[in-house]
Amino acid sequence: MARLLLLTNSSSASADVMPALGLLQHDVKILPIEASVLVEPPVVDCLLIDARRDLPAAKSFTKLITSTGVDVPIMAITTEGGLSAINADWGIADVILDTAGPAEVDARIRIVIGKDAITQLANNP
């Protein structure tokens, strides 16, 4: 079970942002997309950024996160139409559609967390 932080400006539950999250056993904490979250971020394995509606704001926030030294993988949640706007400049580990099923969501979370763990071990032998 992974510890996830979902950053969203939606007032709904995580299952409304990405329905598959509601079916998985991960521990999901939800906070607003605000810079103040980065002052004392909770200990998590992965950040999920809600990029479904405001792509420019989501991109700016992912760049802010990477510039502050937060050292966990970031996944952007977007719609199919938003995929065309996302590129390497965002500084994210992965992107996933908000309509992805539970198996895909779980696999992608495990992969980005696993890759991050391997990178951490390689950088700190």
Annotated model-derived regions:
Residues 1-5:
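Extreme N-terminal starter segment of soluble prokaryotic enzymes
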Residues 10-16, 22-85:
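Conserved phosphotransfer microenvironments
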Residues 100-109, 113:
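C-terminal output helix
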